């Protein structure tokens, strides 16, 4: 029987580059505006990409005297499309985020002194959380101040599972109750502009408690030879101690009633020891009937011999002469 899943590969998100650059429209010349850069990630869950508008991001900002402390609030966890106006000669700094395109997150705070955003007690769903902190905007000239540049980073990782089978399509092989257990599903995360540092702190769920759940696969043996579950957005964390559980069930010709087995597999750490923000990971395994029950024996074939070709001789052909 299969004892472990095998990590096939990692798709790396291009966090230091972007494919889209959109300048947010500003209603008036002196209004504070933003331009956004969002790093790429491979398609899977509902992702936030570079095609953004100011109505998609939320902003927290502070300003103060030139060279002094930035302690006066502006943009109090409000949409980037909200209109505020530059104060002549002041310094500004902004923190921004987007929880996918799913709206405001109330548990966010921004430390202007350390250029750090904090997301308290955050639980991923299907939304791609991205965060950014601007450079300090110093000694503003209100009439000519340009848009504030924001380069967003992905705060979460993505993890998916691929199930394969060699079972014939006369059978129904269902995979259900796919879930990650003993992983962190609720945590406090920080993004610090210096070094683009992302950190998360939280406690793992217990044995038998779902940290992240995946969609059931109705029939793996449907003639396509494999079926992929969707990816989930997940808190970045160490992989050690985390496991995946699922229920495999097979029915069909000669199998009455259906055979079912709940399978638990610790995630290997040989190739990947932690899930990093902005990266996508895939685990794959093969499930056949013998992994579900030992009551079934597959039909197998032994090729005893394929005979060699015998020589039948070589015969010359005479070409007829040309007739006059």
Predicted ranges, named:
Residues 2-324:
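Sec-type signal peptide cleavage vicinity
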């Amino acid at each position: 029987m299969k004892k472990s899943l095998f990590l096939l590969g990692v798709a790396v998100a291009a966090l230091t580059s972007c494919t889209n650059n959109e300048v947010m429209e500003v209603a008036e010349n002196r209004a504070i505006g933003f331009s956004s850069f969002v790093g790429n990630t491979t398609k899977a869950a509902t992702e936030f990409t570079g095609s953004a508008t100011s109505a998609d991001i939320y902003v927290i900002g502070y300003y103060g005297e030139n060279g002094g402390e930035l302690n006066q609030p502006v943009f109090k966890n409000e949409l980037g499309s909200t209109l505020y106006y530059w104060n002549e000669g002041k310094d500004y700094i902004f923190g921004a985020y987007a929880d996918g395109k799913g709206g405001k997150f109330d548990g966010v705070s921004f430390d202007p002194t350390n250029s750090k955003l904090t997301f308290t007690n955050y639980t991923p769903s299907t939304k791609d959380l991205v965060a950014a902190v601007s450079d300090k905007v110093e000694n503003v000239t209100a009439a000519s101040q340009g848009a504030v540049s924001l380069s967003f980073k992905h705060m979460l990782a993505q993890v998916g599972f691929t199930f394969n089978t060699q079972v014939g399509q006369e059978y129904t092989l269902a995979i259900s109750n796919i879930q990650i257990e003993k992983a962190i599903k609720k945590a406090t995360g920080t993004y610090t502009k210096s070094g683009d540092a992302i950190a998360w702190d939280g406690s793992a769920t217990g044995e038998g408690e779902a940290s992240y759940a995946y969609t059931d696969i109705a029939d793996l043996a449907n003639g396509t030879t494999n079926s992929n579950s969707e990816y989930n957005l997940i808190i970045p964390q160490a992989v050690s101690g985390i496991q995946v559980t699922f229920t495999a069930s097979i029915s069909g010709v000669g199998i009455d009633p259906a055979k079912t087995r709940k399978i638990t597999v610790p995630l290997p750490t040989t190739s990947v020891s932690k899930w990093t923000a902005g990266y996508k990971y895939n685990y794959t395994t093969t499930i056949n009937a013998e992994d579900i029950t030992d009551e079934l024996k597959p039909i197998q074939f032994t090729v005893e011999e394929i005979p060699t070709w015998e020589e039948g001789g070589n015969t010359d052909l005479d070409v007829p002469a040309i007739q006059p």
